[in-house]
UniProtKB/Swiss-Prot annotation:
This is Large ribosomal subunit protein uL5m. It comes from Marchantia polymorpha. One of its GO terms (molecular function) is structural constituent of ribosome. It is found in: Mitochondrion. Coiled coil: none annotated. GO terms for biological process: translation. Signal peptide: none annotated. GO terms for cellular component: mitochondrion; ribonucleoprotein complex; ribosome. Keywords: Mitochondrion, Ribonucleoprotein, Ribosomal protein. Belongs to the universal ribosomal protein uL5 family.
Length: 188
């Protein structure tokens, strides 16, 4: 039965995708079936507009973003940081992605995923699937399609998209592909 606290995508996973994966891959136990663990969202924007970016992404994701800092200030490892190298080069892009991030879990994760899947499936957006994660980089043009910030996008025009990493409990890339295809087939 559909509970008002559950998202349609979460209901679809529990009632359709999970039993389907159990039969397709022939697991011995239903707890072996891959599931979504978390979604990590990292916005791309200039560092001086990080407050506007955090606000926009909090509106879209439904959860507060945490401010992060670089882990070190000197040493060899700092030289290989591509963002620091961009700041020192003549061809500076001015966009950093490590200043704010959010990790979505539970109902908030499924609410965000429902909006994301709707946009991705409509525009046939490419994703990169690895062993236990699904990665995609959303452009600014697709960010405008989120209904929460659609009418007030001029306030958030400095956002240059965001990176999304969907972490699953899958053990192989094939399991991750099957899980992701189950979410994309859902008509929302």
């Amino acid at each position: 039965m559909f509970s008002p606290n559950r998202n349609r995508l979460e209901f679809h996973y529990n009632q359709v995708i999970r039993p389907d994966l159990l039969l397709k891959i022939n697991y011995e136990n239903i707890m072996e079936v891959p599931r979504l663990c978390k979604i990590i969202v990292v916005p791309k924007a200039p560092s001086n507009f990080i407050k506007n970016v955090k606000l926009a992404m909090e509106i879209v994701c439904g959860q507060k973003f945490i401010q992060t800092r670089s882990r070190g200030s000197t040493g060899k490892s700092f030289r290989f940081n591509k963002f620091v190298l961009n700041q020192e080069s003549k061809r500076d892009t001015g966009y950093v992605t490590y200043l704010a991030r959010s990790t979505l879990r539970g109902h908030i994760m499924y609410n965000f995923l429902e909006k994301l899947v709707t946009i991705i499936s409509f525009y046939d957006y490419p994703v990169k699937i690895q062993k236990n994660s699904i990665q995609l980089s959303m452009a600014t043009s697709l960010l405008r399609l989120f209904p929460e910030i659609q009418d007030h996008f001029e306030i958030f025009e400095h956002i240059r998209g965001f990176d999304v990493t969907i972490v699953t409990s899958a053990n192989t890339q094939d399991e991750t592909v099957i899980l992701w295809s189950g979410f994309l087939q859902k008509e929302v």
